[in-house]
Amino acid sequence: MRIRQMTSDDLAVVMRWAAGEGWNPGTRDGEFLAIPDPAGLLVAEKAGDLVGSIGMLRFGARFAFAGLYIVRPDHRGGTTGARLALAALEHAGDRIIGTDGVLERIADYEALGFRGAHLHHRHSGAPTPATDPRVRPLAHGDVDVVVGLDDDCFPGDRRGFMRAWLDGDHLVRCWAPDGGQVTGFGVARRAVAGWRIGPLVAPHAGAAEAIVRDLAAALPGEELHLDVITGNPEAVAVATALGMTPGFACVRMYRNGTPQLPLARMWGACTLEAG
C-alpha cells in the first residue's frame, strides 16, 4: 500500500465516498477543497485500487484542517487509517490542526492528540421564508468585507479559498442594516440532498435568523442544512426558531492548541471537510 497525492479523478471518487457516508457534501465541494493545498489531499492505494483518503489542508503557516478521513468499508480494521493519519500529520507539521470527529471515533482522534472543543450539530429543514430590508445579495464591493469577516472567524489564512467560495453558483446573502456596512453573511450551496449553508457569520441571533430566512426565500421548497456551532450558546436556539431539526453531529477538535475565536459571531460552519 502506498500513500500519494490525489488526482482530480481520485478526488471525485472520494467525494462519492463522502456522500455514501451520509455527509451530504456540496456538489462542487471537491473543486474548492483543491484550492488551498492540493498536496494535502492524500489517498491510500493498494494494488492500483483506492482504499482510503484524508485531506490535511494547510491554511498558512499556523493552521491546518483535517477532513475527508475515510477508509473504504472493506479495508477497515487494518492499518490503512493509521498510515493515512500519520502521513497527514507529517504534512501539517507543528501547526494547530482542526478536525471534525465523528462521535463513534472520538477515542481514535484523542489518541492522536486531538482534544474536543464543541459540537457541530447539523440541523435540517425548510425554514419559513422571509425577506428583510437589512439583508441583500452580495455585491462586488462587498467581497473584501465578507472575506475579512470570515478571516476574523477562522484561525488560518483561507482568504483565497473564500473568494472562490463566494463566486460561481453559490448563493450569498449579506446583513447590512440601514444600507450600511456589511457585518454578517451566509452562503448556501447545492448539496447531494438540498442545500448546505455555511459559513454563517452574524453579529447577533436576529441577523443570523434573517439571513437564513432570506436564503430560504431564494430557494423555495428546498431543504436547508446548517452545521450549527454549539460553541455559540444561542446558535441551537436560532436553528430551532427556524424550524430545523437536529441530525448528524460531530466534535470540533484541535491538536497542538485551541485557537481563540469569536464564537458569539459564528453560527454555522463552512464545511466539515475544510473547516
Annotate the PLM regions.
Residues 1-29, 117-157, 265-270:
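Short amphipathic alpha-helix that is part of the acyltransferase structural core
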Residues 7-12, 45-46, 58, 62, ...:
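Intrinsically disordered, low-complexity, positively biased terminal segments
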Residues 26, 31-52, 65, 119, ...:
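A short helix-loop-beta-strand connector motif used in the catalytic cores of GNAT acetyltransferases and
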Residues 31, 102, 122, 252:
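Residue-level "edge-of-site" marker
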Residues 68-70:
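Non-membrane alpha-helical segments in proteins
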Residues 103-118:
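Internal alpha/beta loop-helix hairpins
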Residues 115-123, 245-251:
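Short Pro/Gly-enriched coil loops immediately N-terminal to beta-strands
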